[in-house]
Curated annotation (Swiss-Prot):
UniProt record, GO biological process: isopentenyl diphosphate biosynthetic process, methylerythritol 4-phosphate pathway
Disulphide connectivity of cysteines: none
CDD domains in alphabetical order: CDP-ME_synthetase (cd02516)
Listed InterPro entries: IspD, IspD/TarI, IspD/TarI_cytidylyltransf_bact, ISPD_synthase_CS, Nucleotide-diphossugar_trans
Species: Chloroherpeton thalassium (strain ATCC 35110 / GB-78)
Listed pathway(s): Isoprenoid biosynthesis; isopentenyl diphosphate biosynthesis via DXP pathway; isopentenyl diphosphate from 1-deoxy-D-xylulose 5-phosphate: step 2/6
Enzyme Commission designation: 2.7.7.60
SUPFAM superfamilies the UniProt entry points to: Nucleotide-diphospho-sugar transferases
Function noted in UniProt: Catalyzes the formation of 4-diphosphocytidyl-2-C-methyl-D-erythritol from CTP and 2-C-methyl-D-erythritol 4-phosphate (MEP).
Catalytic reactions on record: 2-C-methyl-D-erythritol 4-phosphate + CTP + H(+) = 4-CDP-2-C-methyl-D-erythritol + diphosphate
Site positions per UniProt: Positions MEP for the nucleophilic attack: 166, 224
GO molecular function, one term: 2-C-methyl-D-erythritol 4-phosphate cytidylyltransferase activity
Name of this chain's protein: 2-C-methyl-D-erythritol 4-phosphate cytidylyltransferase
Amino acid sequence: MQAIAIIAASGVGKRMKLPSGKTKQYLKLGVYPVIYYALSAFQQASSVEAIFVATLPSHIAYLQKMARRYGFHKVKFVIEGGKERQDSIFNCVEKIREVYGDDGALQDKVILIHDGVRPFIQPNEIDEIAELSKSFGACVPATKPKDTIKYIDGDDNRFFGETLDRSKLLQVQTPQGFRADLIMSAHQKAQSDSFYATDDAALTEAYFPEQKIKIFEMGYHNIKITTPEDMDLGKAILKRLRQSK
């Protein structure tokens, strides 16, 4: 079994409050840009045969140069992303279809979809998710929430509603893995219906409700760089990961 990775790197990161033209995936975290670490992990993962990256048009040449410079030979295509994250994933799905064709070349393969701003995923975790995706059809990493979670009052959003049972909740992350034909079909259907979901797992749930999604319990290191505070936390995680190797 070989996996194909899709890296979503088209976001502009409004919550990061960056100057115009700058995006969070290219901020320096230690020596390298945030996205470097994600690409490096997928390059090292033995289950991954090819990486497709969706990014802003102005960053395509930069990412291609990065892949050459650091020997990320699994990065096969860097293409233009879409208006929304889901559009970017769809663009990569269509590129995969174009490259592999519909003659069975994708049979027994899985597709792993990852956020380019989750730099701390580890190669062994990628391999485990790929294997579980193959075995169960779909697999998504998640962590247990540390905080109490409450609904907002439905009648007045200035107040809380009921408290949720934390033991039945998980915070979902990436990479999310799926049997190739399953996720490609889900994206094609969603594109036809102009339907948008919060992530690829939700898309699968919408179009293939019979497909159970295996839980892969992840540690708390696999954060998504979203706000300025995440960069400070990221530096601490990077230091700890380096010390543990």
